[in-house]
Amino acid sequence: MALLGTILLPLLGFALLGLFGKRMREPLPGVLASGLVLASFLLGAGLLLSGGARFQAEWLPGIPFSLLLDNLSGFMLLIVTGVGFLIHVYAIGYMGGDPGYSRFFAYFNLFIAMMLTLVLADSYPVMFIGWEGVGLASFLLIGFWYKNPQYADSARKAFIVNRIGDLGFMLGMAILWALYGTLSISELKEAMEGPLKNPDLLALAGLLLFLGAVGKSAQIPLMVWLPDAMAGPTPVSALIHAATMVTAGVYLIARSSFLYSVLPDVSYAIAVVGLLTAAYGALSAFGQTDIKKIVAYSTISQLGYMFLAAGVGAYWVALFHVFTHAFFKALLFLASGSVIHALGGEQDVRKMGGLWKHLPQTRWHALIGALALGGLPLLSGFWSKDAILAATLTYPFGGVGFYVGALLVAVLTAMYAMRWFVLVFLGEERGHHHPHEAPPVMLWPNHLLALGSVLAGYLALPHPLPNVLEPFLKPALAEVEAHHLSLGAEWGLIALSAAVALLGLWAGFVFFQRKVFPAWYLAFEAASREAFYVDRAYNALIVNPLKALAEALFYGDRGLLSGYFGLGGAARSLGQGLARLQTGYLRVYALLFVLGALLLLGVMRW
């Protein structure tokens, strides 16, 4: 029952704030919501330290409501509630004075409750409840300022695109049920230790579940919703689109590693999609001018790295990057929020610059976040990214092509990370006046996230240094044999990874301080700003034709129904008109008789 309590605590916050939040004064709703998330973190940590926990209750015939806290789900619980708590505290200051203050924290708590349902689920239907729940909560949070039509449209777009992936999730569950008669993750894991039932159909189930992950984690081709999701308040971007919801797809693959480890072709497809998405996100980040959209495309790219790791079979490495990414990406979003707060809502990086001297604490948060993203040696992002690069060469579904592609993306990542930092904090001031530093309630969470961005990678250092995370996670994951590199080869790859990161950071720092750019770069930047016209292509090839078809069907239905109901109306009107002729006066009938006879004679003569 205590395990269920980790979900019920934030759910209680949602209920209390939804019912009584308007009667509470600031900052009480934020304090209450943050306190309940912290309580959930402490409860989950205590259960994990005591050896894990289970909860099971009757739900549907043959489908119990089952929860499991093992090392994998416990690891995700600590990320969701730990980083989530810091973002809640930050939002107390960021959302101050907003008329929807209590509503915001109600939605925030709902999201945490649904995310915990997703990660603790021991069956796919229970996971799907959390899956849909975080989709609903993200819809409410992205469209939080719903009176702005553009923001409301962005929320709908995110919701609809994710439904495509959700359909894949449901169909995948249906196939697994048909094959094995159960959707319990623990039971399926045991069943697949023996001979596989219908490998082709099982591969289709794996692809369909992967489609669900593609939608939730914004992978090619369903990545178009995430940049538009920046319409929500900045803490929403940090919580949902950096640390938690968008990594749900990676978690689904890791939790289903018993399935994907026996499907090499599907795993290879996952790795290919991951690498392509990593490259697409990195290239698209260069042209963005919105401070949050640069970080959003970076998120797409980093999620691609995670899928690449999971695809080659390095499930624990993918989760390692989930962990480090939660810190430095949340830090980048919240540092962006502090900049937006300092500039009175301005988000265009072309109107920034020179903020280094005005924001003495936020500048360090931003620098640490950018360097961790860029893979500066010894920061957390370096260790997890290096582990991904090494995994492409040592795990069974990897290969040299994956390594080279990931290495090139690492250079691009370091360059656009420096572009973001240079445009915002360095150079001359452009278009802003009297920026002010964020209040302490917004700075302290960033201090802790910055600390995590530096230190989180030290949980899994390369051989022969200590690696705590791999032995902690591996018992909950499928066993995939990886061949080990020699010590010299391993550290040679680390040196190459470090050199590539330093080269990219230096090149980005130098190149983006220029005032005039070459023509080739301006052409590339223009295409990058439009994300290489993918959205436009989708609108032209899919959205607009479907919209035209829907409108044609609508007007066709309306005309058909109007005609159908019009026949009855016409008969009724005719009857009412004829009824008026029945007056009961003999002279009227005589007149009508004479007129009818004359009409008949006229017709006969004609």
Swiss-Prot record:
GO terms for biological process: ATP synthesis coupled electron transport; electron transport coupled proton transport. The keyword Repressor does not apply. It catalyses: a quinone + NADH + 5 H(+)(in) = a quinol + NAD(+) + 4 H(+)(out). It is a multi-pass membrane protein. GO terms for molecular function: NADH dehydrogenase (ubiquinone) activity; quinone binding. GO terms for cellular component: plasma membrane. It is an enzyme of class 7 (translocase). The keyword rRNA processing does not apply. Its EC number is 7.1.1.-. The chain crosses the membrane at residues 1-21, 29-49, 75-95, 104-124, 126-146, 165-185, 206-226, 234-254, 266-286, 303-323, 325-345, 364-384, 397-417, 441-461, 492-512, 584-604. NDH-1 shuttles electrons from NADH, via FMN and iron-sulfur (Fe-S) centers, to quinones in the respiratory chain. The immediate electron acceptor for the enzyme in this species is menaquinone. Couples the redox reaction to proton translocation (for every two electrons transferred, four hydrogen ions are translocated across the cytoplasmic membrane), and thus conserves the redox energy in a proton gradient required for the synthesis of ATP. NDH-1 is composed of 15 different subunits, Nqo1 to Nqo15. The complex has a L-shaped structure, with the hydrophobic arm (subunits Nqo7, Nqo8 and Nqo10 to Nqo14) embedded in the membrane and the hydrophilic peripheral arm (subunits Nqo1 to Nqo6, Nqo9 and Nqo15) protruding into the bacterial cytoplasm. The hydrophilic domain contains all the redox centers. Belongs to the complex I subunit 5 family. This is NADH-quinone oxidoreductase subunit 12. It comes from Thermus thermophilus (strain ATCC 27634 / DSM 579 / HB8). The gene is nqo12.
